[in-house]
Amino acid sequence: MASSAQSGGSSGGPAVPTVQRGIVKMVLSGCAIIVRGQPRGGPPPERQINLSNIRAGNLARRAAVAQPDAKDTPDEPWAFPAREFLRKKLIGKEVCFTIENKTPQGREYGMIYLGKDTNGENIAESLVAEGLATRREGMRANNPEQNRLAECEEQAKASKKGMWSEGNGSHTIRDLKYTIENPRHFVDSHHQKPVNAIIEHVRDGSVVRALLLPDYYLVTVMLSGIKCPTFRREADGSETPEPFAAEAKFFTESRLLQRDVQIILESCHNQNILGTILHPNGNITELLLKEGFARCVDWSIAVYTRGAEKLRAAERFAKERRLRIWRDYVAPTANLDQKDKQFVAKVMQVLNADAIVVKLNSGDYKTIHLSSIRPPRLEGENTQDKNKKLRPLYDIPYMFEAREFLRKKLIGKKVNVTVDYIRPASPATDTVPAFSERTCATVTIGGINIAEALVSKGLATVIRYRQDDDQRSSHYDELLAAEARAIKNGKGLHSKKEVPIHRVADISGDTQKAKQFLPFLQRAGRSEAVVEYVFSGSRLKLYLPKETCLITFLLAGIECPRGARNLPGLVQEGEPFSEEATLFTKELVLQREVEVEVESMDKAGNFIGWLHIDGANLSVLLVEHALSKVHFTAERSAYYKSLLSAEEAAKQKKEKVWAHYEEQPVEELMPVLEEKERSASYKPVFVTEITDDLHFYVQDVETGTQLEKLMENMRNDIASHPPVEGSYAPRRGEFCIAKFVDGEWYRARVEKVESPAKVHVFYIDYGNREILPSTRLGTLPPAFSTRVLPAQATEYAFAFIQVPQDEDARTDAVDSVVRDIQNTQCLLNVEHLSAGCPHVTLQFADSKGDVGLGLVKEGLVMVEVRKEKQFQKVITEYLNAQESAKSARLNLWRYGDFRADDADEFGYSR
């Protein structure tokens, strides 16, 4: 264990003691130490050396547990100062020693010198000189060593050092306390402030015996958050070390044994104190983990005051390098590519309360389970009626609340997914159903761990694992802390209150119940709903929160391709583009909040009507994307014109259901058009906005007072409860409130989100548009939504005129209209419908003059010649006005009739 050296001398002289070297591991008393060699492939051998020719006081000793009559032995005077003198001088230092005597029992006595040779400080002489030990009596006085010891002792006596000082030395006797009556109170009384201590014994790498100063409490301290391999006690009393137990113990011993440290007392467990040992050279807890000598333990990691993440990171460091206890470690995601371990995806569906379906950038769908959490579940076998089919979402307490929390937070949003582990498929057993392979991950949005948020609200619980089970969340400690908070605050599943009950009536396919509900739903107008399931492009299952019922809903006004169906004895194939239509509807509305208008029901008890998502009609959207055709029943609907316009646009693209469309000659429709008569029914309107393409927005004068009242009430409400700046996250198509340049709030709709600083909004009651930062936007209060008062600005275009395509000419026309009619009251008559918006004639309220005709007279626009019979009188008047403008060479006509030769060049069409 220790190197040796022979002192020089004649071959015939007396034998010179061999000089040996070692590192001082421990000081047993004022006259005995343990030295060790250098480690080579494992803990080194050890050896006890007793100092020759001197005697120091005996240290205190606790009575043996097996001897009930025995009593604790206290320190002898000056015994502890002698031990401390050697401890501070020798621990961890290299010494050399010579063995002078060895007893039959194996005890070795000799001289110890500090340093690499015998020229160093003689430890025995130093002890005697300090008055901490006495020279043994009866030794030969002519011995040179004895003579030096005698001189040292005389000097100590003369200087009254140590035991030669006045008094009996009782002040050097420690009042040792071996037990603590109330460990919890003892720990709390220190308020996690560092306590000075000496490590007296190392049981294993993570458990030590410490002497707390200055009150001399001798306590067992377990390192918080970790566990090292231990020594298993066998039946015969021997100890068998687990792999790396001896190495871990030596690692701690060589750094802490009999060192001055500070300990943060953090908690207690079975009379043992949990703590963190601080040493100037580092934190032993983290070092043990980093070197692969320890593993994290869940039951105590939460009390580690320096943050559980530091311990997990240190453990991860050792795992990645397969150090020591992790030599056979295989990472849970070792077989995954980096792009599959971490990715961004869009949430398309929430499955109950612990899983989501996401859409990857590749367009593929993937089910992700939230790592290490368990959704709410039924407790006990008798809680469910055997004859009643279980509906987990509504029948399991807090399942609905958990699903709703995830749905509102995640649906349609992009999230960050970090895969923690892959749970392999498992076969079914008598008690457990079969499970397919599961991808378990940590999902975050805006830096928030969704699983942690769910647990903190008491809407899920944390799964407990075996200590060696590494398949768990990478943020497992945060989950445990969140659960502890939820339990403490009595949240959700941990609440002492009665569990919430959701009595949801499922009237899907129940004709009798559907008939009873129909009048209520028809009278309700637009009702709020959540899309629970999408059967096909036009068939959905809805949850109506106000009515607390589930209904099957069919989209009105369209004919959507039918999907494949299982019929008795055969499978009916789906129509072309049925799957595309279903996917389109799923991506757009599944688990979204929508508005529905119920118009009727079919024989099977399914409701028929219109569904709106973010202000858009789903029937129109399906037609627009060539995934449905307009059904003849839509003619009676207010959305018929929008459907026709969408269908016409889809036909022109010749895609999907219109891929083989052949356009019919227009002439065939003309006789039908000629049968109509022009109706002139002018109504008063207020013009609020003129667009650059000469469209304009108006408000109905009859509902103007309603708008004024709503705006007044809304602004009062906002003044009382102002929106928190920056709290609103705008989404395209969403209604909101926006602060205009005048500092007032108005209703608006988000048209585009470029960035938080650039949000395009449309003021729905006035028709103007603006680009604003999101800090000037807020949530539209439900009391002032479009259900209470529809958007008041309606878009129109001038009938019978053709707007110049030349930018300067068009600007002249727009400027003229702005001067004449913006922010004034006019009279409006709808002449004909067209794609985009209705075309109208507009009259000045006072003179009844035709605004469009005035533009023609001034040569600012051209006439759009229409062939319908009912318009011929008006067209003639417009053409005569155009001829007058041409003759006078006004504006467009200043260079004559340019249309014959230069129409294409100047951007006009005749």
UniProtKB/Swiss-Prot annotation:
Keywords: Acetylation, Cytoplasm, Endonuclease, Hydrolase, Isopeptide bond, Nuclease, Nucleus, Phosphoprotein, Repeat, Transcription, Transcription regulation, Ubl conjugation
Positions of crosslink type Glycyl lysine isopeptide (Lys-Gly) (interchain with G-Cter in SUMO2): 513
A cellular component annotation (GO) from this entry: nucleus
GO molecular function: endonuclease activity, active with either ribo- or deoxyribonucleic acids and producing 3'-phosphomonoesters; nuclease activity; RISC complex binding; RNA binding; RNA endonuclease activity
Modified residues (Phosphoserine): 426, 645, 785, 909
Ranges where the TNase-like domain occurs: 18-166, 193-328, 341-496, 525-660
Name of protein: Staphylococcal nuclease domain-containing protein 1
